[in-house]
Amino acid sequence: FEGAYSTGAQEHIYMEPQGMLAEYDKGILTVYGSMQCPYYVKNALLPAFGFSEDRIRIIQTTTGGGFGGKEDFPSLIAGHAALGSYKTGKPVKIILVRHTDILMTPKRHPSKISIRTALDSKDQILGMEIQILIDGGAYEGLSSVVLQRALFASTGVYRIPNARITALALATNTVPNGAFRGFGAPQAYFAIETHMQELAQFIKQDPVKFKRSNCVDYGDSTLTGGTIKEPVMVDELLAKLKEISGLDPFNLPRREVKNGKIRAYGFSLFKHGCGFTGSGERDKIKALVKLRRNTDGTVEILVANTEIGQGAHTTLRKVVAETLGVPFSTIILNNPDTSRVPDSGPTVASRTAMIVGNLLYRAALKLKNQGTVGEEITVEERYAQPPEIVWDQETFVGDAYPAFSWGTNLVEVEADPLTLEVQVKNFWGTYDIGIPLDERVAEGQMTGGISQGIGYATVEVLQNREGRFLQQTMTDCIIPTA
């Protein structure tokens, strides 16, 4: 059974466009800006200018959204602003207007994914052959990282005995594409979930039952030969989905036509690998965090991770406050300044709470048992790969991620076959995210992700003509709104 599935580009449409301010003064280059990864910017400017580390200082300013769009691109305009200030001796500020931001900045990679599945005489899956093509745009950028995650997500949550996968990022004459929430996984899950739905219909089985019967479980092997090391709570998620929706996922209402409109339900399962893909945390990032207890009893968190509207500061402060057993108000966390904070890694890939939060937890335990009240003391903690997480980057064999979150989605949709208008009438989702460090922050992240997913599937369109997007403003670049 074969199928081909495609997705388009998606604009981040963060509320605040890209912007940088650079100042070269007394041999020191300081750059302020809207960014997710201050050390990415610093590490880009160091070879560009040939300066020593102490001559470049990057300060993140309050940032109005990112979603991956302010991961690597800020380094480009930081370089432009920095060069201007270096040459003129005056401060230089570059703020992109909206149409320029849409024109220049990376988008979610468009994709074309083909899946071919072999079944035995009892309709059991024998294997899959998958081809993944993503549109990288004019330069590689983060395409290799996006391609890896798409590759590792390509068989979804399913137990596939044999798989052969070809994955390519193609150079084209469009804007370079880059990171965007999930970076490769949404494209892959759209393909595999649609394919499994169509496959179930082809063999005349209920799609939800077919998906559940083929789902991986605790102890099973992953696509890359790793192991599912934690309980898979799919049955519990399905039970909760039934409770909150009032609908039995295994017996969903059939498609119906009423008043000339089609009403139907869609269902999907997913898992998401947490943190950097493969050996990124171990070999590239090597995150370092510090905690400093001041003489007045306050404790300052020293990390490079940024608050971009996702609630990172609240979450990290809560981790430290609760571990130390002190009031939340005594924990200080300012926007990062590379002259003061260590490189704890980028604010990407759902790693801030899990990786950096855990490092801060361990640092707080150290601090709790050191020094006396009124004494200034600094402790640090560096990331070390757990010995049970084994990965070979050369062969792509082992545990591509240290842990997974799991989820179910159920959507009720109404479509008008004459006007092609689609309305999402209801949406329900259940997610296994472990222990939420802050329930309001976690709920906000889930709500935001759902909204972006619905928008990507329904109203968000980027039309490309000769390498340029026709959509140029927030008026014609439509996204879901309240």
Give a label for each model feature.
Residues 1-430:
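Structural alpha/beta core scaffold segments of enzyme domains
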Residues 434-438:
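Cytochrome P450 core scaffold surrounding the K-helix E-X-X-R motif
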Residues 440-444:
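Short Gly/aromatic-enriched secondary-structure transition segments
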Residues 261, 273, 281-282, 461-482:
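Glycine-rich active-site loop/lid that clamps phosphate-bearing ligands
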